[in-house]
């Protein structure tokens, strides 16, 4: 025990006053900041978990609640003055001994900034409104329903139900049954999205998850509704990050504000136009991330515990951002489609009323994966390889769905070059006419498209055979320009590789009937092996 600690102990022992809360002597007259910090830390250790102060990336946070549940807030020195009074009786050394007092913001700042206080309070990484599943070393799982010092997670909410695996798979499929996914691979990725927060929050899967980009062909297709369903499974209302074109608050600032709340789910809503955020790209790959907090020290955050979704009908991504994303394409249901109904109302209300069961369904799949040894696929067609190989194995071998990345390459490329849709339609007609593998000129590609009733660029809706020479040249020129843009945006060494086919471009010398020769560009559609 230091001399200062002995001095403080002797003062407290000589005091005959009985205090309802543990006594804490503020610095001054022989009491140093370290002594006060130690006394306060002990007071917080004896308090209820949600009343404690926590160390999050060497910044002090407190747990608060709103209508959406628990969250973290950076503790300001002004607020610390009253927070200290909730767990202790604040004292100072007066002329006649110990006297009750209040803490000034300046004194509070010295305490919460001291390494002694920061190292004495518990660490926290995440606050959730539902239990969190963790992995044991013996390929079993445990579920956290309160504060867990090892993981730094404070979980609240109702415990998850134990759900048999077969029932769990049926529940998750039923949850998605009203969505009109563009392809079977999109459903696999939607199932992966439902599982990912459970896998990464407690680091059962210690890997970075990509941003889940929900693309819709039309308004009201269900992309935003999907984020609400996923949030309901975890008893969370995802923190929303808005993309603003003017005024205060950039998307980077809004992301930092959402991250500091400590809630695991974040939604970037209704992206439009070009998304170019180096800060967000850094967050998706950095091992640690420093989130800026107004009027406080930055908080160091572990990005691997967070799950970000984004919704859009039409947006452009940089190649780096596209590589950090996983795309789920949703089509709008026909007007006459009949959606599921439940005693509680729609599927969202049903999940909220039965949240412990749906979370139990997610946990059942996670437990089965852990029981089987956390196996992964030997290869991955995504830059986030660890996440992709694990979720690909789960959706194939436990959920019995198609491979995770089916159709993903095209969805990814579409955000960089919307002409990819035109190229896929051209491939469909070239293949149907038996011209695959043949070297075709722009005019021959136009003939294939015209036979399939595909509108030709530059033709203004007129069929190819009805165009005059100038119109035909215009169509061929437009097709050539479209191919050039595709190769410029997506090509590597005059090749574009998609899931179903590759497009190869080559220049050849052509001899015409007149005897003249010239260089011409040919395009070959090569089916995938």
Predicted regions and their residues:
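Loop/turn-to-beta-strand initiation segments
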Residues: 262-265, 288-290, 303-308
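N-terminal pre-Walker A segment at the start of P-loop NTPase domains
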Residues: 185-200
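N-terminal nucleic-acid engagement/recognition segments and initiation subdomains in replication
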Residues: 1-185, 202, 253-254, 258-260, ...
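Conserved catalytic/switch belt of AAA+ P-loop NTPases
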Residues: 276-300
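Conserved AAA+/SF3 P-loop NTPase catalytic/coupling segment centered on the Walker-B
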Residues: 264-285, 314-323
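DNA transaction DNA-binding modules
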Residues: 215-218, 225, 237, 251-256, ...
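Phosphate-sensing "switch" segment of ASCE/P-loop ATPases
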Residues: 134, 142-165, 172-174, 302-306, ...
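Post-Walker A helix-loop "phosphate-sensing" segment adjacent to the P-loop in P-loop NTPases
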Residues: 232-243, 287, 490-492
